């Protein structure tokens, strides 16, 4: 009888700690930098389409998070003395895709002092209030499409242009 109870106890423990196969997520590894290097003491805010908000405080520039599939999430990268950067994620993926490719994200924040020193700072600030990137899964390339790189290049060109 003791053996049966012990067996049932272990069986229950294994089922309690095992992960449900239906739960899939996108693993995002990111590094947050500015013009001078990696940033520390960051706030990363996850804002979900249903209004749920999760806030992460991290001391290091490198961090990872997991977002469940079939979610639409806005990530905000916040650091004192820098303009907040927003990146939107659409984690809709085909059901037949069992192994999700992870995603590496490099986020470059702009210093508030730099933004305040340019001529068109109001226009730049308005532009920065919108998501600077949209990441979604591309079934044709079977990888994540990242428009954030093009937005960052455009912002950097506008900043350089204002100094000429």
Give the role of each language-model region.
Residues 1-26:
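Bacterial Sec-dependent N-terminal signal peptides
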Residues 20, 92-132:
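Extracellular beta-sheet/turn segments enriched in Thr/Pro/Gly and aliphatic residues
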Residues 26, 35-49, 132-134:
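Short, ordered, surface-exposed loop/turn motifs in non-cytosolic proteins
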Residues 50-62:
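Short, acidic Ser/Thr/Gly-rich low-complexity loop/linker segments typical of extracellular
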Residues 64-74, 80:
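Short Pro-Gly-centered beta-turn/loop motif in secreted/extracellular proteins
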Residues 78-92:
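A short, solvent-exposed loop/turn motif at the edges and junctions
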Residues 124-164:
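Conserved, compact domain cores that house catalytic/ligand-binding motifs in diverse enzymes
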């Amino acid at each position: 009888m003791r053996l049966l109870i012990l067996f049932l106890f272990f069986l229950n423990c294994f089922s309690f700690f095992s992960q449900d196969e239906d739960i899939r997520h996108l693993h995002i590894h990111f590094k947050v930098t500015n013009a001078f290097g990696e940033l520390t003491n960051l706030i990363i805010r996850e804002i979900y389409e249903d209004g749920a908000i999760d806030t992460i405080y991290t001391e290091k520039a490198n961090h990872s998070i997991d977002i469940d599939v079939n979610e639409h999430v806005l990530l905000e990268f916040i650091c004192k003395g820098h303009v907040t950067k927003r990146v939107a994620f659409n984690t809709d993926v085909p059901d037949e895709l069992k192994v999700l490719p992870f995603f590496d994200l490099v986020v470059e924040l702009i210093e508030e002092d730099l933004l305040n020193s340019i001529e068109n700072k109001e226009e730049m600030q308005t532009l920065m209030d919108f998501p600077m990137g949209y990441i979604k899964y591309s079934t044709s390339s079977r990888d994540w499409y990242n428009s954030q790189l093009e937005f960052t290049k455009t912002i950097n060109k506008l900043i350089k242009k204002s100094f000429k």
